[in-house]
């Protein structure tokens, strides 16, 4: 049985799980178990399919009798799609295991319907990766968007519905851009098959138009700036295992689409240099502003969603380098850029999935998203705390975890730009490196804040004081992802050549030197990555701080004493503990132009019960783009909708007239 046949069985299981959930409406507990177990098995088969295809190393193509003449049903599984299937299936397995007990919280609240939409969501993502026809690609892309939209609005409260509407608008705006790009290529090729697109040699102007349409269309799904506004609202609104899939793998469909169009469908046309520079620029801006806005958040899931914008930016940085390499016919830049992009795509799926599952575990016990109402959870939820600690270290690119490895390769790709003689790239490379360095520092600060405020210190609410560990299936799911974060880092010298082979096969570039003890990336001294030295670095860096800590502890043990914290003469209260607002305050001053601070008087906040005064604190920090651009657009759209609402008269005859008028306009347009 080949990889495509295995993948077909995986899709059948997802569809069976979705239909079974639909027929079990009202029997939520049974639907949760059936949906979770079936999708788990489907994910395992998907993993086997991806590994089988990567091991075989050949492109598989299957054609079926089309239901429409213009839309051939063709499946094509190459190295990139197999890699994406593997990444998605890994996270599906873990999230399915997690859902078996997590979804009990939604019993009686539409859990069976959520199982239906969840499995449709997974199936559409996986099928989209191997679809080789523009019509069916768009159909599956829309299925993915609509099913995830239903998951976003699952709670049916005002916040989730507002988030869902913004997501719906931006997702479909992106779909329209992608559709126009495919129609332009279809007009030139006379077919909607991707195979015909690959043979096109478009004019520079038309090729650039197609690329920009596809880039911003798929970029809206990826959550890159400036099309990111839906992401920090929609992802936190969904159930946590759905958030893990949306943030961990759904946004990567956007990255996949950008790679597919720019480096596959338009490869015959050729890539202008400015395409890669544009992708690098937007990636750098997304990375820096994404982590900066994450730092300002008090909502734990919104913080993680903003961090996804940051990591999408890092991936786009590496993708931009790869596109520059293709433009300059430089296989080193191309392969190293894709190595960094694909490695970080995999790693981000794992540690972001882990952190969203950890956030879901916390929220299920404390019933709040506000980190200021958490604290001291490491004592009460030790397994969750341990798993989240690994996730925070990984996402902060701290060795010896996987986030460090992929960001290291991204750095290598940027260093490799120094070999290029183009002045624009000699300027773009250092600027991107500075922005990536600042991003890395802010990311460490962000997740120190998240972990410290959430798991350390004193409990800041009754729910935090009474919190208990989550059930074993949720713990096992989180620990599996934590173990993968460590395992992938330690196997980097084995895994990197495999990913480089995927990059080579996808772009048809000459393979770089890959061997044990030999530089993974051939080039000058400062661009070389040696597996043995990298492994030594991974083992040594975490060991040195540990030795220093033991030395300091032995020296100070004799002089240490324990007592109450000094509170300036007042009795200690948990509200006096350091807060996320305090951590962020210096950055609010430095980057004040990028934030709009909202304050609200709260009479319930009193540091001392004997003081009946009103204290003020920042309730939210609104990003500049959302406040100055997105909010006015939304308001204008709402006003326009009210103005044209009279067209919805309820008169069926008038609606028929609208249809006839639209048909006449279309016929005139075609005739002209």
Curated annotation (Swiss-Prot):
One of its GO terms (molecular function) is NADH dehydrogenase (ubiquinone) activity. It is an enzyme of class 1 (oxidoreductase). Residues 27-30, 101-119, 186-199, 264-272, 333-342, 406-427, 496-504, 553-651 are cytoplasmic. One of its GO terms (biological process) is formate oxidation. Keywords: Cell inner membrane, Cell membrane, Membrane, Oxidoreductase, Transmembrane, Transmembrane helix. Its EC number is 1.-.-.-. Possible component of hydrogenase 4. This is Hydrogenase-4 component B. It comes from Escherichia coli (strain K12). The lineage of its organism: Bacteria, Pseudomonadati, Pseudomonadota, Gammaproteobacteria, Enterobacterales.
